């Protein structure tokens, strides 16, 4: 018989738990792990980490390999001028000064590799979080208390908890003590289940993310103070949970394995993470190690190294696979190709000898282009496990923050020992600064590089990607905000009713008569106490006046509405495989009340797919286009030749026949059409122009930061912007093909011959500089600077003697801008070698600065970007997206005002405005720019004069308050164009209200040259000052601020990435989908939500006031006229489903009619579906119907007798309650059904279900229920003819006034929707099916006095314009 007890396993378990208890003791007492005592999580077999800095020297071979140079070329010239992005300096500082300046700087993070310097050991310990990500709100232990706490933060839930607790006191509610908890429990349980499911999904994603495997260097010393500082209670919980889990694991496996000898403290602490990944075991960790062969140091000969000559590495150091959650600050990790970056890493070395690698940041900022990153010169030698473990240095960097594009720090390493005369403490400290270009951020993916070794700088919650999460502000819809005041009014009404009941109860109790004394044995001395008790009893009785389930019902309805938006195939983009994705489910009704839309231009109104169309070279203009140019000329009523298209096609054909040097794989895709340019490029007669064309296109092929890649034998360009890609592609199409950009060498095939250029420096583009420059050295050793940028920054930097070409180029660029093209200038200069070396020293010093590095680099860059030679200018077309003009026309008819906020030039924005129907030739355009108005007072005077002479306003506060209430469409004859500098003036408090007054009189507002912060400021100004619902739409990272500021943010998934769509409330594929999102789903959702909330208050009022009227009949003693189960199930089963169905499915007209008649949307802008008038109309209707329901039953019982079929009189309170509750349930459900705009099968089914459930419950409960008084009540009352008479009479009297009013209103005072539906009903199905998708054949009825608007170019016709008297 086999043994049932494994004694070896038990023995091993004892020793393991003993070690675990020691670890827990140290953990609970917070023993810091310094200088080799590395206590961290991870399933690795750790060696002795107590070893210090080794004193043995490298072998001669390793030393020679460390000092190897990049190549002979770098040795001859670049020894004194390093890569600009990786510049470094060495400085000598004393240990005394070093310690003195760093003693207590909390703004600096220090990370030590291998050991802590002696002078730093007195510094306070720094605690770092683990790399474990936790986005869940709850844990299994904290879920119930924390979720309940969050739910009871809602004042309504807290109120109902108080009422429920009151019901537990027999003095206030002597019966049904247990049942009182059911309604609140159902609400809390439903919400808890929803929150639990959402949190479980987050937990699954967290677990998957945390258990992703990565390569980590083990067997070396991580000398930092590790782990996050957590409280004693959390440590105790972790200790208990880990102990229980590990014991269960050990007992589970004790019969399978021979023992648990390999179970140690280190791998116990992470047993959970190991078990969660089926492909990851302890054995696989030890076997799945990674060998890295040493590669020689690529640093320059004069650079310092973090590996000292007397240092030696650990022979036990090796890279092993671990879970990413076990990474700690100070760990060294290796990332392989196509792997995700597990933490924020400082790049130590790469596979490339020059230290470059490429990353994709799509998961971080949504951009799909590759970005180049660089290893530090001092750490390029760390290419193997041995060398990484031998390195000794420390890093000083910024504390964690959320900026994705900024990170400054410095690497410091001890140098050689000096004599006392040279230094105070005889220590030389080497420093090399680094920036964001040397850091790999968590969330990026390594591309086009075999491997990268990095040092962990930030982990877990301190990484950039985590710092940028959760920044989206919590938004609430306007209805939700208004609903808070409605709830407050209901609370006040409830308290007034309770106080009224208490006063009358005390009055009734004060009456001394024989009946009261005989029946109650009470006298008037207890009257005040009865009044106080009655107040609390009434609070329990009338609690449904404040709807307990309203908020959860709204969440359910909004979730279903969001699903409908997601499932709409008309908003599905097949090219991007992108549906409309709602990310904020609680603001869907705001989509139906948008009055102002703020839109970006590039990538939002346009496709962000750049096409090179025209250029100016040496004062000669090239290029023809008939796409957007034709459209703009037509809209501006300019002279347009209909034969232009044919001429362009013939010119293209002639060009392709002549062109023989292009390396374009598909010549038909060429967008730059100019046979004259090809003739000049290939001409042997006009040498000067031929050379100019040659140098211009060579500059296009060299001045960029494009990364080349080959996929399936196809050359791919990965550019940081679509503009750069367009420039490089057009150079390729005309024989200047960029073949390779690796190792900072550009290989270009020019006329069939490969040319190599060494990239010495790249001065990147910034929004402040508005230009970028590349410094290159050609094969002849000549150094060139090529610069491209805006004309406003290039022209001032040109050398003298170019007046003729400058004037011609300016005219050409102005012409290009007037045609809607994006323009750039291209310039160059040849630099003397000695001048470059002197500039390089200053540039290195600027790059080495720890503080204000960007400003210093920009200042030094100005020194070399001077005396430029103008080569020419470019014109790039950004085509409009599909149906943009038609969508803008629809939105304008709907009464929505569209403002365009763009960073483009004024001329470009104006012409895009013409092309997309924002502007027309008959408009008067008010231009406000800093060139014309240089001071705030001048801008204010201009706006006041414009308001006075054009619109008759004096700019007073009274006029502004009047305009706040005016939501009518502005004049179609005026528009405003303002630039970013002038916008700073109008955003001031002194001028802002005048600017808004002027904007309300203009159809279109174009804000040009604006920054992201200015975009957000404009949105905030309109939203807060005008008290309107705003929407912002964009596609780039620069649009995130205004998207988050607006009431509704919409992001477009485009070429610029997904930064906007990730921060938005709704993500769509193209701008044209916005029309359907607002005019169909927005209008539906707003109308449905308003109707649902009105129904909710109505049904609760009618039910509550029946109980209130009954109190007059029984002297306010707080008794129910219904059976208590009816009170409990009223909101849960009897009336809830019809309200939810109405909020989800009701619609007045279908989607196609909504799109054809955008003017229907104006009711949402005016707030006509939900306002105080509508609320009180439903409240008063409910009060009236409650009086009818109670009064009819009271009347018939007072003057008549009811006898059951058994001959028994029907006169008990339970029977009378059934006489009242039955018609009440009928009335409520019929009222909801008949107030819906359209009846459908789902509505009828839910209506029958609600009525059926009421009667099923009534019969079952009256037959088998525990209530003696209610026993057989259903069978007694329902078999009497009088019961049904009372029911029919009550229904008729309740519903007759409401539906009489509706009929009269539709006949004599029809709204626009009534006229439209009447017309639709009169039309045949054949006529309806023959209508087009963009034009409606719905004609105006003769009853409406407002005319139809004129047809637009797209064929869109408005339907009925609103007559204010009918609203």
Swiss-Prot record:
> What are the top taxonomic ranks of the organism?
Eukaryota, Fungi, Dikarya, Ascomycota, Taphrinomycotina
Name this polypeptide is given? Phospholipid-transporting ATPase C4F10.16c
Q: Which family does it belong to?
A: Belongs to the cation transport ATPase (P-type) (TC 3.A.3) family. Type IV subfamily.
Kindly state which reaction or reactions the protein catalyses: ATP + H2O + phospholipidSide 1 = ADP + phosphate + phospholipidSide 2; a 1,2-diacyl-sn-glycero-3-phosphoethanolamine(out) + ATP + H2O = a 1,2-diacyl-sn-glycero-3-phosphoethanolamine(in) + ADP + phosphate + H(+); a 1,2-diacyl-sn-glycero-3-phosphocholine(out) + ATP + H2O = a 1,2-diacyl-sn-glycero-3-phosphocholine(in) + ADP + phosphate + H(+); a beta-D-glucosyl-(1<->1')-N-acylsphing-4-enine(out) + ATP + H2O = a beta-D-glucosyl-(1<->1')-N-acylsphing-4-enine(in) + ADP + phosphate + H(+)
* Gene3D superfamilies (alphabetical): Calcium-transporting ATPase, cytoplasmic domain N, Calcium-transporting ATPase, cytoplasmic transduction domain A, HAD superfamily/HAD-like
Name the cofactor(s) required for activity, per the record: Mg(2+)
ATP-binding keyword on record: yes
Q: Which residues lie on this side of the membrane: Lumenal?
A: 173-177, 504-531, 1113-1124, 1198-1212, 1262-1276
In the Enzyme Commission scheme, what number(s) does this protein have? 7.6.2.1
